[in-house]
Design a protein with these regions (language model features):
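Short loop/turn segments that flank or connect secondary-structure elements
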Residues: 1-162
């Protein structure tokens, strides 16, 4: 029987931080930008990191996700041709967001000891973005950064939502 009075764990509770690690597997995780929750991305935006974010679109083009940008994609859509450049916050094998309170949940959680669990974390963060709160934060990011492709983004979202 389902206990309707039980509080569901927050994503931060469900996906606790891992121990820092500089092994090859973990460093490779760090090269690919991890995702913030909507709340975390809002804090990062308020902390002045908006111009270093990119807008990733869901495969079905019905919602977006703000994440640390690939080098070369800062303040733009996530473009596949820049994916090999890595995260713009990853410099000299270190994360510039580490210890700032703005490191993405997905980055804090993923670790070589948690093989296969990163995908669950990613999917749960995706659900967090496919919400009104996610859409509202993207609109704030568009205003704050002067995102040059705002009208194109709005056209994509309007034409793909049912």
């Amino acid at each position: 029987m389902h206990n309707s009075g039980a509080k569901e764990k927050s994503l931060v509770e469900k996906y606790p931080p891992s121990e820092p690690c500089s092994c090859e597997i973990c460093v490779n995780y760090c090269k690919r930008p991890g995702w913030w929750t909507v709340e975390e991305a809002g804090r990062a935006l308020d902390a002045g990191f908006g111009k270093r974010m990119m807008l990733e679109m869901a495969p079905e083009l019905t919602f977006g996700v703000l994440s640390p940008a690939f080098k070369g994609c800062e303040g733009n859509f996530a473009l596949n041709e820049f994916s090999e450049n890595g995260c713009n916050f990853f410099k000299n094998s270190l994360c510039q967001l580490f210890g700032t309170g703005c490191q993405p949940l997905e980055c804090r959680f993923c670790h070589h000891d948690r093989r296969g669990e990163g995908e669950k974390c990613h999917l749960d963060i995706e659900k967090d973005w496919n919400t009104k709160a996610g859409s509202k934060l993207i609109e704030k990011w568009i205003r704050v950064t002067g995102f040059p492709c705002a009208s194109y983004y709005h056209m994509i979202i309007r034409s793909n939502r049912k």
